[in-house]
Amino acid sequence: MKAKVIIKLKDTILDPQGLTIHHALETLGYKNIESLRSGKFFEIELNVEDREKAVEIVDEICKKLLANPVTEEYQFTIE
């Protein structure tokens, strides 16, 4: 099974990287972009057959290592 994980800063946290990219895009002429937030994306190959077990493992990985629960939120899909 494959997990696809997206981690982003919480909406209440300032995103300086996203702001920098947004300003750069405006400089390049992309004036129609309202806002931009950056984040991280991970693909994780799992050697499990049970979908519920895969969800449990990926959720645990996100909580323990990939995401900072104070500043970030995450979501994932299992394929």
Regions found by a protein language model. Name each.
Residues 2-4, 8-41, 58-79:
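Long, contiguous binding/interaction regions
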Residues 42-47:
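Amphipathic alpha-helical segments that form the core helices of the histone-fold
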Residues 48-52:
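Helix N-cap motif at beta-to-alpha junctions
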